[in-house]
């Protein structure tokens, strides 16, 4: 949907060559790239006076918005915090196709699929290193998630069309209009605004706050050199993504991925929240499997 990466802090100059190549390839493929709806992506609230909520979500990409909107729908107070100047993260710059078994388009096209087949393909594609229970939770939850995105969030998908990745037994992937994550982030951001969910950008989480019993009850943040503490009665949700844009961290956990390897991740994908969670007692697993 867009070749305009100005909404990704720090990406503009380093992406000029990539953007030229993308635009050229798009023209040859007959695809029209549109500008990102910057107003929807950037229109975030100022730092609110309220610091106490039922739920605090850290990270305003696709997962963070989904978590915040779900919390709001359940009737609890929620705030969404994002360290970058704009929302979106990797979700914004992704291809955004979504594998969904038994979708409305598969049924229309007469494609036979199932969550079980989706799980088999996923496990095989990951060299069977994935946890089958977790994979099956994902594949069985894909259709309800896609229906929520379409019916509640208002995501538009290409009609009568699906994509098939290498490793898929059949065509399962829904394609958002524009073929990037812009469709997701602009619509999720707009719905968060409509639901009056405070979304604060430029707010970097630096530490989790525990009470005397060792329970995480808040998150300490920094913005423009000032400290802000946000507290949550129900819990803190970390939706901060991975660390593929942190070369030192990548090399630490997978030495074979040294300085020769670049990344497709958004600039903010640097992994500080993983260490923050670890300091609070979380166990980090599978850190060697990294999106590059």
List where the protein language model places each region.
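Short glycine/serine/threonine-rich phosphate/pyrophosphate-binding segments
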Residues: 62-67, 246-247
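Glycine-rich FAD pyrophosphate-binding loop
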Residues: 73-93
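Active-site- and interface-proximal helix/loop "cap" or "latch" segments in soluble metabolic
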Residues: 1-40
């Amino acid at each position: 949907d867009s070749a305009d990466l100005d909404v990704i802090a720090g990406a503009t100059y380093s992406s000029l060559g990539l953007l030229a190549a993308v635009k050229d390839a798009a023209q040859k493929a007959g695809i029209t790239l549109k500008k990102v709806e910057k107003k929807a992506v950037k229109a975030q609230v100022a730092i609110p006076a309220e610091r106490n909520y039922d739920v605090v979500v850290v990270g305003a990409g696709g997962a963070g918005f989904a978590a915040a909107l779900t919390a709001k729908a359940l009737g609890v107070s929620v705030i969404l915090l994002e360290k970058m100047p704009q929302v979106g993260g990797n979700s914004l710059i992704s291809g955004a196709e979504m594998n969904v078994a038994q979708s409305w388009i598969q049924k229309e096209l007469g494609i036979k699929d199932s969550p079980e087949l989706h799980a088999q393909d996923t496990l095989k594609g990951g060299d069977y290193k994935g946890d089958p229970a977790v994979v099956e939770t994902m594949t069985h939850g894909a259709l309800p998630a896609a229906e929520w995105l379409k019916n509640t969030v208002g995501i538009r998908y290409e009609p009568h069309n699906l994509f098939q990745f290498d490793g898929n037994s059949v065509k399962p992937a829904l394609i958002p209009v524009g073929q990037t994550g812009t469709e997701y982030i602009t619509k999720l951001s707009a719905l968060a605004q409509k639901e009056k969910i405070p979304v604060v950008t430029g707010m970097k989480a630096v530490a989790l706050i525990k009470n005397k019993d060792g329970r995480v009850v808040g998150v300490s943040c920094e913005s423009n050199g000032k400290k802000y503490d946000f507290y949550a009665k129900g819990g803190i949700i970390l939706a901060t993504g991975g660390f593929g844009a942190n070369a030192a961290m990548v090399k630490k956990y997978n030495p074979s991925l040294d300085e020769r390897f670049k990344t497709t991740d958004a600039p903010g994908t640097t992994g500080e929240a993983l260490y923050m969670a670890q300091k609070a007692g979380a166990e980090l697993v599978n850190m060697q499997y990294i999106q590059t």
